[in-house]
C-alpha cells in the first residue's frame, strides 16, 4: 500500500448533482417501465399456460369418451355375436368374444393411463 498524499485528499472530485425530477426521469423511470413490461409479459404467459393445460385436459377428456364408446361398442358387438351366432360355429363366436374381451381390456388399460396422465397434469397445475 502506498501512503496517501495530502494533496490528493484536499482536492475532492466534483460530482454532478441532478435535480430530483431529472434523477427520476433518467434512472428510475426506465427501470419502472421495464419492470411493468416484465410483469405484463409474465401475466400473459401465465394465461397462455393455463389455456394450454385446459386444452390438453379437454382433449384427454374427449379421448376418454371415445375410448369408452369403443369399449361399449365392442362389448355390445361381442354380446350380439354370442346371442345370435346364426350359421357360424360355436368356436368362431367364442374366438370373437375372446378378441372383443382382449380389445376391451386393452382399451380399459389405455383409459386408465389417460386418467393417470390427467391426474398428473391437474396435480402439476395445482403446484
From Swiss-Prot:
Primary subcellular site in the record, as a coarse category: nucleus
Subcellular location: Nucleus; Cytoplasm, Perinuclear region
Keyword Nucleus on entry: yes
Organism domain of life: Eukaryota
An annotated GO cellular component: nucleoplasm
InterPro entries: MRFAP1 (IPR029254)
Subunit note: Found in a complex composed of MORF4L1, MRFAP1 and RB1. Interacts via its N-terminus with MORF4L1. Interacts with CSTB and MORF4L2.
Identification of the protein by name: MORF4 family-associated protein 1
The organism of origin for this protein: Homo sapiens
Lineage: Eukaryota, Metazoa, Chordata, Craniata, Vertebrata
Amino acid at each position: 500500500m502506498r501512503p496517501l498524499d495530502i494533496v490528493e485528499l484536499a482536492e475532492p472530485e466534483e460530482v454532478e448533482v441532478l435535480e430530483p425530477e431529472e434523477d427520476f426521469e433518467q434512472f428510475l423511470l426506465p427501470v419502472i417501465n421495464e419492470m411493468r413490461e416484465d410483469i405484463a409479459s409474465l401475466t400473459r404467459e401465465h394465461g397462455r399456460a393455463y389455456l394450454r393445460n385446459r386444452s390438453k385436459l379437454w382433449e384427454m377428456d374427449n379421448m376418454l369418451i371415445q375410448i369408452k364408446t369403443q369399449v361399449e361398442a365392442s362389448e355390445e358387438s361381442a354380446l350380439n355375436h354370442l346371442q345370435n351366432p346364426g350359421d357360424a360355429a360355436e368356436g368362431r363366436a367364442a374366438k370373437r368374444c375372446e378378441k372383443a374381451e382382449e380389445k376391451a381390456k386393452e382399451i380399459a388399460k389405455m383409459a386408465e393411463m389417460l386418467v393417470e396422465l390427467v391426474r398428473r397434469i391437474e396435480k402439476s397445475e395445482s403446484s
